[in-house]
A protein has these predicted regions:
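Active-site-adjacent beta->alpha loops and helix N-cap segments on the catalytic face
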Residues: 2-3, 55-57, 74-79, 103-104, ...
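Anionic-ligand binding region
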Residues: 135, 150-167
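Glycine-rich, proline-tolerant flexible connector loops at the mouths of alpha/beta enzymes
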Residues: 45-72
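N-terminal amphipathic alpha-helix/helix-capping segment at the start of soluble metabolic enzymes
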Residues: 1-16
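Conserved, mostly hydrophobic/aromatic
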Residues: 47, 113, 160
Length: 184
């Protein structure tokens, strides 16, 4: 298990905010990471934009579109993390989709993430049964592959929790909101 993630949960529950990298810009994202840390974030999720974020609601989908339209790439996100790590040791995990990792090259993506100081990786579109392809590379480089648990059977929850690293991302609902709501 990653040391910084373990330390983030030493006091029990952790405050874990999320931000889509590059919305509205990578410079603003960097400053928001510092602000979140200053506000008490125990760990920060950095979303690497993807063109088809199927596990997200409309607000984060639009943030992904804006970031990609603004020219955000995986390499530019990595460069931003390098800058952040010069000023911050707050635990950070990437949240992105398997295709982002595949297209970059799984080994190259995870190795680079580790080298720049990332602590974990969340891939919401990778089922528990298919995580091994990523898990072995993550373990090799000291990155926690964060497991997701959606509403499911008690047996499946127990199995996923038993094998989890870092922390468990609990999905509270399988519903996606496809139209804007007042909560946007």
């Amino acid at each position: 298990m990653n040391k910084r993630i373990t330390e983030a949960f030493e006091k029990g529950k952790a405050f874990i905010p999320f931000i889509t990298c590059g919305d509205p810009s990578l410079e603003v994202t960097e400053q928001l990471v510092y602000a979140m840390e200053e506000a008490g974030a125990d760990l920060i999720e950095l979303g690497i934009p993807f063109s088809d974020p199927t596990a997200e609601g409309p607000v984060i989908q639009r943030a992904n579109v804006r970031a990609l339209s603004g020219g955000v790439t995986t390499d530019k996100v990595f460069d931003m993390v390098v800058k952040i790590r010069k000023n911050s040791s707050v635990p950070m995990v990437f949240m992105t989709y398997a295709n982002v990792v595949f297209s970059y090259g799984t080994e190259r993506f995870i190795k680079t993430a580790a080298e720049i100081g990332m602590d974990g990786l969340i891939l919401p579109d990778v089922p528990f049964e298919e995580k091994e392809e990523f898990d072995s590379v993550c373990k090799k480089h000291g990155i926690d592959l964060i497991s997701l648990i959606a509403p499911t059977s008690h047996e499946r929850v127990a199995q996923i929790a038993k094998d989890a690293e870092g922390f468990v991302y609990c999905v509270s609902s399988c519903l996606l909101y496809t139209s804007p709501s007042p909560r946007d």
